[in-house]
């Protein structure tokens, strides 16, 4: 295996940064090279709802949710690196996607 791309996303950037540091430490222990973490643009989803269930169209409330994303590239990955990545315990709030690149 030559290169692995790890995409992470979470609603809380502190939890995401902690997960990235855990991953990079595990990769560095195996001797592989780490590129990143590369911060990607934060997606902001906004929702506007009426406060009243019946009337008062002018009275509205707005909510937003922010999705923070990071990319970590692993160069010169060995089977030991993959084993270490599979054994990691990350926070359940963090969505992790792992892809093998050529």
Swiss-Prot record:
The keyword Transcription regulation does not apply. One of its GO terms (biological process) is translation. GO terms for cellular component: ribonucleoprotein complex; ribosome. One of its GO terms (molecular function) is structural constituent of ribosome. Gene3D superfamilies: Ribosomal protein S10 domain (3.30.70.600). Disulfide bonds: none annotated. Keywords: Ribonucleoprotein, Ribosomal protein. SMART domains: Ribosomal_S10 (SM01403). The keyword Ribonucleoprotein applies. InterPro entries: Ribosomal_uS10, Ribosomal_uS10_dom, Ribosomal_uS10_dom_sf. Belongs to the universal ribosomal protein uS10 family. Part of the 30S ribosomal subunit. Involved in the binding of tRNA to the ribosomes. This is Small ribosomal subunit protein uS10. The gene is rpsJ.
């Amino acid at each position: 295996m030559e290169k692995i791309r790890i995409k992470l996303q979470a609603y809380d950037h502190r939890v995401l940064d902690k997960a990235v540091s855990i991953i990079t430490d595990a990769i560095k222990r195996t001797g592989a090279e780490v590129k990143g973490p590369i911060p990607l643009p934060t997606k902001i989803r906004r929702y506007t709802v009426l406060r009243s269930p019946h009337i008062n169209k002018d009275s509205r409330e707005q909510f937003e949710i922010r999705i923070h994303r990071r990319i970590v590239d692993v160069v010169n990955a060995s089977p030991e690196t993959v084993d270490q990545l599979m054994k990691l315990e990350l926070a359940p709030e963090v969505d992790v996607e792992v892809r093998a690149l050529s």
